[in-house]
Curated annotation (Swiss-Prot):
Residues 1-229 are cytoplasmic. It comes from Bos taurus. Residues 1-95 are annotated as: Transcription activation (acidic). Residues 186-193 are annotated as: Leucine-zipper. This is Cyclic AMP-responsive element-binding protein 3.
Amino acid sequence: MSHMELALDPGDHDLLGFLLEESGGLGAAPDEALTSPPDWELPLSESLSDWDVEDFLSCLPSPPAVLNVFSNSDPCLVQHDHTYSLSQEHVSIDLDNESYEKERAQMTPLRVEEPADQEIARLILTEEEKRLLEKEGLTLPGMLPLTKMEEQVLKRVRRKIRNKKSAQESRRKKKVYVGGLESRVLKYTAQNLELQNKVQLLEEQNLSLLDQLRRLQAMVIQTANKASSSSTCVLVLLFSFCLLLVPAMYSSDTRGSLPAEHRVLSRQLRALPSEDPPQLEPPALQSEVPKDSLNPELQAASNSCCLFHLMPQAPRAEPPLQLPLPDGFSGCSCPDSISPLHANLTREEGWLPTPSPTSVILQGRYSG
């Protein structure tokens, strides 16, 4: 039987009894301790100090469980009117084996729960971390806590894994970006080729339009030359027609408006019927001179010639003067019907009038 000595104040006996009652079948020990003779009390010199008592209480296995019970119990059980304080006196308490075994029986459930806490604190590593640790030739325990070296190794491995993941992510983003750029380059290259084809087609159309424009200009120039040549031809024809028409119109106008001094006096001889029937008029006198004579000088010459032969002459007179006539009138002679009259006059040896004189009328006529 083990004896524990405690220095207690008389007011602390109630507290100790309460603690023993709450702890189970430990109530007999305080009774025995109280009923024990007072010879077990030690002198003050041999009593423990306050610090020793605290160390002793902290070494006891039961106080944590007892304190947990008090903390989890109803607060009404803790509230008392008593005030407890440790005194300077120390008492010794003897605890038998039965009470100690009961305390151990109550503490066993708490000791069973400790392995569960250790399982929760087990170190869990990923496959990547295990592979890197194996690659570096390091091993970590499967349970916590770890030493500082092991923690540094674990941090270094996890840092490498994070850097690797970030590098992979950056490479993935870069690959996506480069792929987007390549797709854009291919797209813009296709568009550039299409635009080049369009530009080439437009250049060909421009050249064809320029060729058509040159042809149209040549056609316009040709039509302008043809129009100018046709207009010149028309103008030449009109001018020639005017040149041909104006003189004819001028000649007809001038013929109608000749002055009177240029008119030729034409005379026509007409013989009246005589009383002598055998005497006939010369046929030349019976025939009238045509009115519309184109040459009035010729007509005047013929008339004068006829008059010259018909004029009576005085006897023993000189022969008449013969005037020179133009070449056109050199062959002109009076008609043959006048020759008998002239012969008759000469036969009578003188220009004597016949018994039946013939009257001659001179009639003036304008011919223009």
